[in-house]
């Protein structure tokens, strides 16, 4: 997905900031990451409250390889229909935003 695609998807619901990371893009709303895009796939933030909903739909978590191990992050694939249908995207976005809001903010590193 291009940055334009991400803006088109998210901006009708909330102002977003995009930042490059993991060879992909992170999507921020109100200073919190709500999604990551890697290799054209969008993964939405989950937590213990929202993860079961994603699992019920058979959606897969974001994984990557590090030091010979498979690492799993708390982001799940977005359903295919949500890419093209704003009405289908809205509830999934809401779940991701709520999960991000419940997560503690990362502490800022002290400047030297």
Region locations from a protein language model:
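Charge-dense, helix-prone N-terminal extensions
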Residues: 1-112
């Amino acid at each position: 997905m291009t940055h334009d695609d991400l803006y088109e998807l998210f901006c009708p619901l909330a102002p977003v900031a995009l930042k490059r990371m993991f060879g992909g893009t992170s999507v921020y709303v109100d200073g919190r990451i709500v999604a990551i895009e890697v290799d054209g796939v969008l993964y939405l933030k989950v937590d213990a409250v929202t993860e079961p909903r994603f699992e019920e739909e058979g959606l897969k978590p974001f994984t990557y390889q590090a030091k010979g191990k498979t690492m799993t992050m708390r982001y799940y694939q977005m359903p295919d229909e949500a890419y093209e249908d704003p009405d289908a995207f809205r509830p999934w976005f809401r779940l991701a935003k709520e999960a991000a809001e419940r997560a503690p903010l990362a502490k800022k590193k002290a400047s030297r």
